[in-house]
Amino acid sequence: MRLLSLLFLLFVTAALPAQQKTIHFTNGQWFNGSSFTAGEFYSVNGYLTKSKPAVVDTIVDLKNQFVIPPFGEAHNHSPETDQDLDVYIERYLSDGIFYIKNPNSIPFATNKIAHRLNKLNSVDVLFANGGITANGGHPSTLYPYLLTTTYKKALPGWTAKSFEGEAYYLINSKEELEKKWPYILAQKPGFIKFYLIFSEEYKERKDDTAFNGKKGIDPGLAGIIVKKAHAAGLKVSAHAETPNDLKVALLAGVDEINHLPGYQVRWRGGYTADYYKLDKNIVRLFKKKRVHVDPTYSLLKTELKPVTNEQYKAQVNVQTYNLQLLRKYKVPVTIGCDSYNLTAKTEMEYLQSLNVYSNLELLKMWCEVTPAAIFPNRKITKLQEGYEASFLVLPNNPLEKFDQVYNINLRVKQGLLLW
């Protein structure tokens, strides 16, 4: 099935100009933000309209199936290189994911694949380029390993030193920030990302190599980075690991939080799951600042598994507690899995299993909140007049059986019938 989908995708690429026609979509059950309404739409020049155009090229009978906006992926590190690019594109589209946010990427690599992205027959991606961290900070220590795995074939000739200034920027002071900022902007990032990791222990960890990979920037730089980014018209995402990291980031004025405390527990460092519990003051700050967060809680099952069952249960309890607080205070949650090889489908399946949110809330997170967080200036989150004619068609009502979101019968992107 994957192969057939990929062959179809390649066929669509070749036939693209002829495929974007004026289409009349009839007999659909269209998601209106709270329920489904029977109706019809036309796709004209890639946008939805109720007004009948002079010429209709094609009529598509949706046969009373359920229509929802496409999904977003708030945190992923693919696509990034040309290695297996077709596979990644097909995987996202197959899962109904049209919009992707990559919060740490390599511009040397992404520039080479830019012509393959943000097209009608592909996925739309926003890249942060390299993240801002400090000497010995995450993710700088991760790349020597990735050079032997993920990037082994994709970046021939690269060494561990090649990643500095591409995958990350080492900034330890305000002076270094001022010096490197023009270069960061010259790389044309789609947004800015910086790393806070145990900011409450910054001074103790700063020069201790035992904490390499387990530290981030000086928390005192957070507000300065945000101010400079906003002045340049760029939004800011912050990697946060602890409740204090959240507080620092929120007070600094970031627009988005990557990770919610509890996605990882540093058991070997002597920390317990309860260390990552949020309090009401921080969650109220979330609401006040109108900041959204991508929990990436599925990492507990995919990459950051605890050693014992007791640890696993304790971490799940903290995750559930934190999400219940976010829900109580109506903090917007986006969906992303922080992976190179998985998609947001993994995160959604995991969040669903925690039974914190209703089917309606989960659906809106994935097809409204997440796409809006990636491309806030595009009309992609509703099925209304003047919005992009991009949507997914499901055989049954996902508000009744949520697993229907994984059972997609048709994908349409800006009026282009994919498959």
What residue ranges belong to the model's regions?
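N-terminal metal-binding scaffold of metallo-dependent hydrolase/deaminase domains
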Residues: 1, 16-54, 396-401, 416-417
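Sec-dependent N-terminal signal peptides
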Residues: 3-14
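Histidine-centered catalytic micro-motifs
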Residues: 69-80, 229, 236-243, 257
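Divalent-metal coordination cores built from histidine and acidic residues
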Residues: 71, 86-207, 214-234, 281-302, ...
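Histidine/acidic-residue-rich catalytic or RNA/ligand-binding cores of hydrolases
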Residues: 82-85, 139, 203-205, 246-254, ...
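His/Asp/Glu-enriched, well-ordered alpha-helical/loop segment
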Residues: 315-397
